[in-house]
Amino acid sequence: GIPVNGMENGSVYWSNWSGLADVTNSIQVQRGIGLSKLGLFSVGGTVNIVTQSTEVNRQGSVYYGIGNDRYQKMGFNLSSGLLPKGWAFSIMGTRTTGDGYVKGTNFEAWSYFANVSKKFGRNHILSLTAFGAPQWHNRRSNKQSIEDYDLHKDGIRMNTCYGYINGQIVPTYSGYNEYHKPQISLNHFWQINGKSTLSTSVYVSNATGGGRKVYGKDANRLQYNYKTGRPNENTSLTPDGLIDYLPVMEDNKNSDHGSDAIFTMGTNSHDWYGLLSTYTNDLSKSLKLTVGIDGRYYKGYHYDKISDLLGGAYYKDNKLAWRDPDTKLREGDKVNQDYLSKILWMGAFAQLEYNREHYKAFVSTSVTSHSYKREDPGKYGAYGNQETYPVANVKTPWSNFVPFSVKAGFNYRFNGMHNVFVNGGYVTKAPMMDNIFVDNTPLSNPIPEKIATGEIGYGFNYRTLSVMLNGYYTQWMDKSVTKAIGSWNGPRACIPNIDARHMGIELEASYQPLEWLRVYGFFTIGDWRWTNDVNFPLFNEQNEKIGEYHAYIKNLHVGNAPQTSAMLGLSCMPVSGLTLGVDFNYYGRHYADFAAADRTDEKDRAEAWKLPDYSTVDLNLNYDFKMGTFRGQLFGNVNNLFNRKYISDALDGSDHTRETAVAWYGFGITWTAGLRISF
């Protein structure tokens, strides 16, 4: 039940939780706005991962796996089970390395998990858990034109975000990331009596890490233009199109004023403390009450620090107001930005469930207090200019929001095999912190986002056949977006009050005609569109407003995800212990991503470029066997079996065509195989 979505932008970075699958006891998935085991309300649904505890038997395992492009993973997992005096222990560790499918994307990741649990009598369990996944990885951040992929020797594995120094791969801007987000939680479960329970978690997460940036007046010499996928006019390149560091390093070395292009680490660390407590009570045989609180305090640390002078003796920076701009800076010194983000969150929720033989109903509500604050001593003009930029202004006032939600649903079961259901809800949501601050200035009068959503569906379950059909309609109002224009660090558009409509139909089914054969699949089709034109301000790097613009996006499809998808799968067990599976996947009506701030021409209301539809085939194998007192499990996966060439992501171009879009191709054929020995 502990939340993991980022407090500032709402994102989930799965690399922070690598290895968690090896200690997962169960996964609770709630789709849409239906009845949830959690009080937290998410429009799309929630995934709750429950890790090992006193319920796990005494066991252990070791694992080794390999895959394409020198992928390797090794790990172990040990659990004591419940010991005679009520204690239970679990520990897990893994290491994963590889070169990556795309050129220059090698990585190394570790993960660890430890749990100590103690049962006190029959009614209390205390559990202390610590886990994390320190990792570093090189990445491809630039999309390229389709023509560039066709002409490049690496084809769809092409990557322009790196070069070589002394024979070693060296990523450039946004091409390297390192992070470690350990989390420690203390959980108490209390079976108060036969009808009521209280579950409480206190947790802390102290994360450190960030990503590489290129900084300085000659930064463009070490990066491509992200909108065109082409080099800048002065980008330093080798004959095969990689970043050529040597001329830049030579110029830095010979400079009489320090380096003109350096590497910095854009640090995004944080301290996050939280309390989550949920009380449940069976008021009667058919009525259940769940109430709870969710409190959080978050402090984010955002600064750039020099990581490599690239041959120079020092660097000078005039962006931080508290430091003399003539200071000679070395590795480890801060440049460009240095600010704190603070978030206070306190929420309460309640859910009432009514369950009878043929029908089930629920109503749920929540209210939350969100408060945002930013402290930015470094972004207030030139050094010593305190008359224009007084010191008191380095701290913003708190920006306060009180969002709430309410949802309700009804499910009717009849004839032992049919059910129909309807769910609806209304949510107000505080805009993410990243979308209300332009440097140290909050947007004037930011308002909460609002979501009205509903779904209706039918289910059929009889012996070997199950079918679920549902339709959904969601109106998202006053959404806020912040977007850099022209370049990664160019002018920023802060676009409030965007409305979108999402509606569609979803079908999923499973059929088992024989004991050893199962057929399953799904089909979804949606219509997701922006529904209004909006005004927005544009700010330059000095936080100065440079104009008001109008974005013409009404009726354009939302980009960056396929709006039609389907899958048909077969799973068979030809012999005892052996499972073979094949999945046929289809994706269509995928519009390229685009920035609303780029749609300022009233005459240009053309749809973003629509990517070609594509399909892939995946295989999987699992074989369970015994070796004396040990249990073995051999498994493997082959994705994109026929090496289908397809575009998975794209950014729209100036005329919304294939020729001006920049894109990433999906991976060709990839595979993994592994062996687990359990005892």
Stretches found by the model and what they are:
Residues 4-31, 50:
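Short acidic/polar hinge/loop motifs at secondary-structure boundaries
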Residues 34-36, 46-81, 93, 97-103, ...:
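Short strand-turn segments of transmembrane beta-barrel domains in outer membranes
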Residues 59, 85-89, 122-128, 195-198, ...:
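Repeated loop/turn-to-beta-strand initiation elements of outer-membrane beta-barrel proteins
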Residues 64-70, 82, 95-99, 132-136, ...:
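Transmembrane beta-strands of outer-membrane beta-barrel pores
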Residues 117, 125-187, 212-264, 327-329:
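Acidic/polar loop-and-plug regions of large Gram-negative outer-membrane beta-barrel proteins
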Residues 131, 170, 411, 422, ...:
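Conserved C-terminal beta-signal and adjacent last beta-strands/turns
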Residues 284-288, 294-296, 330-476, 512-514, ...:
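Structural signature of Gram-negative outer-membrane beta-barrels, strongest in the C-terminal barrel
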Residues 285, 355, 473-475, 495-596, ...:
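Gram-negative outer-membrane beta-barrel transporters
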